[in-house]
Amino acid sequence: MSKVHYHFDHVGSYLRPQALKEAREKFANGEISQEELLKVQDELVKELVHHEVENGLQVVSDGEFGRSWWHLDFLWNLTGFEAYQQEDSYKFHGAKTRTTNVRINGKIAENPNHPFYRDFEYLKSVTPEGITPKVTIPSPSLIINRDHRSDLYADYYDSWTDFLDDLAKA
């Protein structure tokens, strides 16, 4: 009889704690600095990593606590993209969501100051030895021919191939 090997994975996106929601609101209202917001976020990430490890996970995430959307925050912070308000909202389980989206506004490139770098460095710093930290990033397919996100490529690129090459590199 052969032994069945199971493989499990998790995205690592957790519900945002109330303390983080409140800190984000205070930051948005100018009541606290970004540094103060990150202090709250970091403490909650540290607690989450402890919880993940305590519950047997060998691969941990930061809960995506630094994001407002699982995918758009990553794209907004690449060079060559911008956030904008679209007319219609996303539909999720029949409910309307925010209308924020992303579109091209220049040549696409890696942003060396992307906040995901900082967040991942912090995650690594609070991850115990023998445990693997991970981050989830969206694939290029979330740009290509979706929600008109790639419609403006010809404003900045001579060819579709050049656009795809830069997108893949970023």
Go through the PLM ranges and name each one.
Residues M1-A170:
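Domain-level signal for soluble alpha/beta catalytic cores
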